[in-house]
Structure formats: structure tokens, C-alpha cells
A protein has these predicted regions:
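Conserved C-terminal RecA-like helicase domain
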Residues: 83-85, 89-201, 213, 222-224
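Short, surface-exposed basic-aromatic patches at helix termini and helix-loop junctions that form
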Residues: 10-18, 189-193, 210
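Ser/Thr-glycine-rich phosphate-binding loops at phosphate-binding pockets of nucleotides
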Residues: 1-3, 200-205
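Short, intrinsically disordered, charge-balanced linker/junction segments flanking boundaries
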Residues: 13, 220-225
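Conserved P-loop NTPase nucleotide-binding/switch module
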Residues: 208, 216
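Short, ordered loop/turn segments at secondary-structure junctions
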Residues: 25, 204, 221
Length: 225
């Protein structure tokens, strides 16, 4: 597990400098990438720059996200429309949906509320799913039967309109520090058992929890107060 205050815990257990074990070992290869935008409005195109650091092998995936991913046909007018995808929030959610087929994906936000918060990301996801966009739907990667009892639990505890319950109905876990511990454990179990493949979270999820996350989308990294 990831322990952010290992020195304090070591001291509390009566240990010394030599009793803290540090290792650079990683059980899996970590690959880094950055979204780079060009153009504006509906003509915006986003490429994925893999290994953006100079000392690593670099390559780009052009057109990783563009207008084609956000177009849909209006059922009333039968005209093709484009969902607004110019915001960083829309692109973060779109990128996470794009890589869902690779495995469990997390979208990280430094805050739970505000313009750069996890709750806003959950609202953006739900908004996107109201339209038939050409992006993977999280529900298609979830165990619907397993979700049903958890959705009932969340709706009973917090109400059907709570953003966490609405997120789970749409195939995503919302996880942050204001959610009671016992509820977080229920949600973490879904991720651990691979019953769901999308989670929107803050640093609370990383503290003391090992989960099978394949891709991590960093939406915001600076905590605002």
C-alpha cells in the first residue's frame, strides 16, 4: 500500500532510520504522455505525445481526440452536431473514456469541489453520456448485476440525486474524502474486483489502497483552498 507518512508511522512503531525500507522497484512499467491541442473550436484536434521527456523514446498519436469523437446526430432534426469539447475538463473525461478498453482508468483531481474538482468531472461525464458520442461508454465495461445492489445502497443512504449515485448508475465510481469510510470501502471493492473500470478520485483513493488501475488521467494536480 502507499503510505504518505511512513516516517511518522515508523517512529510510532518504535523504529529507527534503518527500519524504513525504500525501494525503486515497480511491478509494472509506467508510461507517461501529454495531451497537446491544436486548432480551436470544433476544429480542435488533440494528439497524445508519449514519453514527452527528452531522454525517453518519443512518439505521437495524432487525432487521439478530435471532432469525430464528439459528434452526434440530433434525433429531432437528424442533423449532425458537435458536443463542445474545448475545455480541459471535457478532454480529460474524453481521454479517460478513450482508453477504457485497456483496463481500469482513473481520472485524478486535486480537489473534490470547484472548477478543478472531482465532482465537476463526474458532472461532465454524466453530461457527455446524455449524447451518443463516439466514445466508449463506462457502463459497457461494468458488471451491471454487481452495480445494482451498490446503487440501491447509495440511493438509500444519500438519495437518488446524489452525484455519487448518479455516477455509479453511469458506470463510474466517484471517490473523495467527504464520502464516509464504509461507503468508500464498498466502492473500492468494486474496483478491486474489476466490477467497474472508471473511477473519478482525489488523493484519498491513493492513500493505503492497492487497486488494479491501468491508466491515470491527471486533470488537476495543485490543491486549491
Amino acid at each position: 500500500a502507499i503510505i504518505p507518512n511512513i516516517e511518522e508511522i515508523n517512529a510510532w512503531l518504535g523504529g529507527g532510520e534503518n527500519t524504513v525500507i525504500r525501494s525503486t522497484y515497480r511491478p509494472a512499467i509506467a508510461e507517461f504522455s501529454v495531451l497537446r491541442s491544436s486548432g480551436s473550436g470544433v476544429n480542435k484536434s488533440v494528439r497524445l505525445d508519449m514519453h514527452p521527456h527528452a531522454q525517453q523514446r518519443q512518439y505521437s498519436i495524432h487525432g487521439f481526440l478530435d471532432r469525430s469523437n464528439f459528434q452526434y446526430v440530433n434525433p429531432q432534426t437528424r442533423r449532425t452536431k458537435t458536443y463542445t469539447f474545448t475545455s480541459t475538463k471535457a478532454l480529460a473525461v474524453g481521454a479517460a473514456r478513450k482508453v477504457l478498453s485497456m483496463g481500469t482508468t482513473a481520472i485524478f483531481a486535486a480537489n473534490k469541489r470547484g472548477n478543478q474538482g472531482a465532482i465537476g468531472l463526474a458532472e461532465e461525464l454524466i453530461k457527455q453520456l446524455e449524447y451518443p458520442l463516439a466514445l466508449p461508454n463506462p457502463v459497457d465495461y461494468a458488471d451491471i448485476e454487481a452495480l445494482r445492489t451498490r446503487i440501491d445502497y447509495l440511493e438509500t443512504e444519500f438519495g437518488a440525486g446524489w452525484i455519487g449515485a448518479r455516477s455509479l448508475r453511469n458506470g463510474a465510481v466517484l471517490h473523495h474524502g467527504d464520502i464516509p469510510q464504509e461507503t468508500r470501502e464498498v466502492l473500492e471493492e468494486l474496483l478491486r474486483d474489476r466490477r467497474i473500470q472508471l473511477v473519478i478520485c482525489t488523493s484519498t483513493l491513493a492513500e493505503g489502497v492497492n487497486l488494479p488501475i491501468r491508466s491515470l488521467v491527471l486533470y488537476s494536480v495543485q490543491r486549491r483552498v
